[in-house]
């Protein structure tokens, strides 16, 4: 029941923000995106990606929904858990929104018996309103520190 109420609240928030002259609630949008990562819902994550999304992390730069979906979402999703963000800066207008801050994540072992790790770093997510008035992730950049053993 709680999940249904939360879903209805999110849907109402996103629907009310779809008017041409209103900005989105970026914190709610990013929490829904992070929630999809934590529930390992690749379909929902990929649904947030713009067709021309760019992803940057260190020397990796991937462009387009297909490449970002395969190389970031599908390859990373099974290796992490408990993703948390701490917002440092955010802003919105009628057509764009961004959030930047720090993240922390559990890095899951690659094989049974190996230790878990802990990762942290900085992030920025840039969202743009699409032609159909839904918000899509247009740019994601992660800069992380070396993974620490737990």
Q: What is the meaning of each model-derived region?
A:
Residues 52-63, 75-78:
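A short gly/proline-enriched turn/hairpin at secondary-structure junctions
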Residues 4, 16-51, 149-150:
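Short, low-complexity N-terminal intrinsically disordered segments enriched in polar/charged residues
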Residues 33, 68-73, 85-90, 103-104, ...:
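Hydrophobic/aromatic beta-strand elements that line small-molecule binding cavities or substrate pockets
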Residues 33, 44-45, 53, 64, ...:
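Hydrophobic pocket/interface hotspot
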């Amino acid at each position: 029941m709680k999940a249904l109420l939360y879903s209805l609240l999110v849907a109402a928030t996103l629907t009310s923000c779809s008017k041409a002259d209103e900005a989105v609630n970026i914190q709610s949008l990013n929490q829904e995106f992070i929630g999809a990562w934590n529930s390992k819902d690749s379909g929902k994550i990929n649904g947030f990606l713009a067709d021309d999304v760019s992803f940057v992390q260190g020397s990796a730069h991937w462009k387009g929904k297909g490449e970002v979906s395969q190389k970031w979402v599908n390859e990373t999703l099974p290796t992490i858990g408990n993703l948390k963000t701490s917002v440092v800066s955010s802003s919105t207008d009628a057509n764009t929104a961004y959030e930047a801050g720090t993240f922390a994540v559990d890095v899951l072992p690659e094989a049974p018996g190996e230790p878990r790790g802990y990762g942290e770093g900085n992030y920025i997510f840039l969202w743009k309103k699409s032609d159909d008035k839904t918000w899509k992730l247009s740019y994601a950049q992660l800069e992380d520190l070396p993974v620490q053993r737990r």
